[in-house]
């Protein structure tokens, strides 16, 4: 039996995915294929490249601190061209691409098709209003409602899946403009099944239902999160088992809560371990 792991988007909360993976590995639950959206694509890529959970956590912390820095060149290019920041994003997203590319290079990898473990990461083509999926498998959609790309630098693919609207600029690749995959598919359960998984374990985050936005930017982020949460619900229902990580002390961009999210991901997954072993016991 092949086990697939689907990881939802959720910003800094994605550290919880790493804690969950640690708990799974410690209990002998071996994953055969993986898929993730937005921050889930970052964790999926690191996992598929065979980084340990300790290495993943260290890299995650490094990414979080570096990625959220304003790039002066990008900032002033927007100012000089009078470009609308909310239309393009406060950050370029180049640091995400560079960081993943460096991690891939250390493993002798470059392109998504270089990864041995089956992997997928959804994104959104903003001009076409269409779902795209980056994968190292030969996948097609006969309905043409979804497009698949299996030849793209890994860093570029992750950046495209994680280009959170209004925060990161769209990722441009071969004439396409890609933004966060959560708009169409924030928890890629169905896509992980297409990788060959017999059963899929999904990990998502509870929504901040009572969070009170304090400014226009927070209102925009909350609105996007509500959209993503709605997209996640149907995918949870199609999972063989789903873990919901409740992280009330964290929000999407609070980098001070990385360890908290990681620890809660680990603890929560251990609490579900008896059920997980029962469902995924045949390997």
List where the protein language model places each region.
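Patatin-like phospholipase
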Residues: 1-37, 45-283
